[in-house]
Curated annotation (Swiss-Prot):
HAMAP family: Exosome_Rrp4. The keyword Iron-sulfur does not apply. The keyword RNA-binding applies. GO terms for biological process: CUT catabolic process; exonucleolytic trimming to generate mature 3'-end of 5.8S rRNA from tricistronic rRNA transcript (SSU-rRNA, 5.8S rRNA, LSU-rRNA); poly(A)-dependent snoRNA 3'-end processing; RNA catabolic process; U4 snRNA 3'-end processing. Residues 59-128 form the S1 motif domain. Non-catalytic component of the exosome, which is a complex involved in RNA degradation. Increases the RNA binding and the efficiency of RNA degradation. Confers strong poly(A) specificity to the exosome. Pfam families: ECR1_N_2, KH_6, S1. One of its GO terms (cellular component) is cytoplasm. Component of the archaeal exosome complex. Forms a trimer of Rrp4 and/or Csl4 subunits. The trimer associates with a hexameric ring-like arrangement composed of 3 Rrp41-Rrp42 heterodimers. It comes from Methanosarcina mazei (strain ATCC BAA-159 / DSM 3647 / Goe1 / Go1 / JCM 11833 / OCM 88). Residues 136-194 form the KH domain. It is found in: Cytoplasm. This is Exosome complex component Rrp4.
């Protein structure tokens, strides 16, 4: 069953203690303050917005794109209303001003952490972590920031399944930018899946839906291959391997949360 879409002013509950994100209380009742999906939990009633800009929070890990290089800072577009600032002191090693364009130049994509956000929305970024680095391969796909939780899935169920079924590396930035890398055909398939997740984020059973979509696309791809290629492929794949693959698919199907 699909989740309920609400608009500002819709009545959500008469238990004011459960008021959560995207709601307001009036006359001892909880109402929606956003256009989004109703989120009902045991102790909270909230609204997940259907759309909206990324609002940075401290310690968010995001993907930024360098837009300006100054003598002491890199300025990056982080898909927020305000740009982010990476000071040279936040780079992992000492950097001279003349080196800065050689290290990170305009157009480069980088995984960074939001170090600080002040009241005037000055956003400071950091790169002092082994997991934070410049992206040299792959490509970036952008989705609405509010859809990021659906790309990750409950307990990481969606992203784990995407990695397994597409054979791609994936990193999801909290600002809605997603880095993907792999073979060209796998990247194309994953991009389609991400667009489908974004378009159907409000639907229930999304992980299973995307899993079936990927299997169907793989089947279409296999059927469209030349006969000669299929013959070669058949000699390389034993029955045991095929059975093992199907067993993995069944295990994934059982582990996935059908309501996620």
């Amino acid at each position: 069953m699909d989740k309920k879409i609400v608009i500002p002013g819709d009545l959500l509950s008469d238990d004011v203690k459960k008021s959560g994100y995207g709601t307001y209380v009036k006359n001892d009742k909880i109402y929606s303050s956003l256009c989004g999906i109703e989120s009902l939990k045991e102790d909270k009633v909230g609204v997940i917005p259907l759309a909206g800009a990324y609002i940075p929070s401290v310690n968010d890990v995001v993907i930024g794109v360098v837009i300006v290089v100054t003598p002491s800072n890199w300025i990056l577009d982080i898909a927020a209303p305000y740009d982010g600032l990476l000071h040279v002191s936040e780079y992992p090693r000492r950097v001279e001003s003349r080196e800065m364009p050689e290290i990170l130049d305009v157009g480069d994509s980088v995984i960074l952490r939001v170090r600080d956000v002040d009241s005037s929305m000055k956003i400071e970024l950091a790169l002092r972590d082994p997991n934070l680095h410049k992206l040299r391969t792959g490509q970036i796909v952008e989705v609405e920031p509010v859809k990021v939780p659906r790309v990750i899935g409950h307990g990481g169920s969606m992203i784990s399944m995407l990695k397994k079924e597409t054979n791609c590396s994936i990193f999801v930035g909290q600002n809605g930018r997603i880095w993907i890398d792999g073979k060209d055909e796998d990247i194309e398939l994953l991009s389609k899946a991400l667009r489908k997740i974004e378009a159907e984020a409000q639907r229930s059973g999304l992980t299973d839906r995307i899993y079936n979509f990927l299997k169907n696309e793989r089947m279409k791809e296999k059927e469209s291959k030349p006969v000669e290629f299929l013959k070669n492929e058949k000699t390389d794949v034993s029955v045991a391997k095929e059975d093992h693959s199907e067993d993995i698919y069944r295990k994934i199907d059982v582990l996935l949360d059908p309501k996620n």
